[in-house]
């Protein structure tokens, strides 16, 4: 038994329902992060960039 930790990980019986719920939760977390962090930050940066471009043309 060279890798006891590996054997512990392989011997754990995880139901497919638990794995599916975990995957759905992870995807939900990614979508929430995109909605609350990435989209507003990108929108703000685009707005600042466009505002700066308009001010340079004057």
From Swiss-Prot:
One of the GO biological process terms: photosynthesis
GO cellular component, one term: photosystem II
Transmembrane segments: 27-47
Keyword Membrane carried by entry: yes
Alphabetical list of InterPro entries matching this protein: PSII_PsbX, PSII_PsbX_type_2_subfam
Keyword annotations: Membrane, Photosynthesis, Photosystem II, Thylakoid, Transmembrane, Transmembrane helix
Pfam family, one: PsbX
Topology term for the membrane: Single-pass membrane protein
Subcellular location as annotated: Cellular thylakoid membrane
Similarity remark: Belongs to the PsbX family. Type 2 subfamily.
Binding partners and assembly: PSII consists of a core antenna complex that captures photons, and an electron transfer chain that converts photonic excitation into a charge separation. PSII forms dimeric complexes.
Protein task: Involved in the binding and/or turnover of quinones at the Q(B) site of Photosystem II.
Protein name (Swiss-Prot/TrEMBL): Photosystem II reaction center X protein
């Amino acid at each position: 038994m060279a890798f006891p930790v590996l054997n512990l990980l392989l011997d754990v019986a995880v139901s497919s329902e638990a794995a599916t719920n975990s995957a759905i939760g992870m995807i939900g977390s990614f979508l929430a992060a995109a909605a609350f962090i990435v989209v507003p930050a990108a929108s703000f940066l685009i707005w600042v960039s466009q505002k700066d471009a308009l001010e340079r043309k004057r």
